[in-house]
Amino acid sequence: MSKLQGTKTLQNLINAFAGESQARNRYTYYASIASKEGYKQIEEIFIDTANNEKEHAKLFFKKIAEYIDVTKDALVLPVTGSYPVALGDTLNNLKFAAAGEN
């Protein structure tokens, strides 16, 4: 049993991992829309941002794995949090992205 098992720290780490993971997907969707609308530079910014979110998620995931032995059994943890669901045209997606980073 890990020192983190059942702690608020572990819950915060898994929530952060989930948040960064879903943000990555959201930015990837936004990049696709920007591309379809002909905004190549904005598409690239969304892709870069998605890649940053992936790296953030990886840090949280690795930190969890440092403290919990996940090599033998999968650890299933509940995720608690609120995550935005917003998808529009590129202008609105830029606004959604800015609001989501505050």
Model feature map: region roles:
Residues 1-102:
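Non-heme di-metal
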